[in-house]
Amino acid sequence: MGKIIFYEDRNFQGRSYECSNDNPDLQPNFNACNSVRVENGCWMIYERPNYMGHQYFLKRGEYPDYQQCQGLNDSPQSSRLLSQNLGIGTNKLRVYERGDSKGEMMEFLEDCPNVYDRFCSHEIHSCNVLDGYWIFYELPNYKGKQYLLRPGEYKRFTDWGSQTAKVGSFRRVIGIC
């Protein structure tokens, strides 16, 4: 079972709210969030209610100055616990240079710290997650905006929540939850 604690002040001070399940609307529980402690599991937190807006992946650990380390201006508005069995088994991802799974395709079984080095493009317009869960990052070396991809077909970049096709890196969510 997962457990995440949101604190109103930095360094785990002030009023706190503990959560062990998905929560589509955190706003009634605290006024601000300046630090987070993940005691169990892996979580995606979202900048807007109902799992909308920018996403941020948090694994077990402490985030004493949450807004600074995540580059956020606002408190998280919703949170989702990722499965404890996430990433067990194989991981397979196909990426495409054009929408609707068209154009040049590459298949990945491992993390990719720099998409351009492997795919010769900064853009992925569609993809198919065949096995496992993956996180796309806007910038190389696992930085920038994050997008969680579950198994399934993503016909265009908007399907995974992005406003652009720019993907700088991606990694498997494996063995860390």
From Swiss-Prot:
Describe the family membership recorded for this protein in Swiss-Prot or TrEMBL. Belongs to the beta/gamma-crystallin family.
Q: Which UniProt keywords apply?
A: Eye lens protein, Repeat
- Tell me the superkingdom of the source: Eukaryota
- Give the organism's phylogenetic lineage: Eukaryota, Metazoa, Chordata, Craniata, Vertebrata
Q: Where are the transmembrane segments?
A: none
A matching Pfam family: Crystall
Task: Drop me one GO molecular function for this one.
Answer: structural constituent of eye lens
Question: What is the protein's name according to its record?
Answer: Gamma-crystallin M1-2
Q: Where is the Beta/gamma crystallin 'Greek key' domain?
A: 2-40, 41-83, 91-131, 132-174
Q: Which SUPFAM superfamilies match?
A: gamma-Crystallin-like (SSF49695)
Binding partners and assembly: Monomer.
For biological process, the GO terms are: lens development in camera-type eye; visual perception
Q: What does this protein do?
A: Crystallins are the dominant structural components of the vertebrate eye lens.
Record-linked Gene3D superfamilies: Crystallins
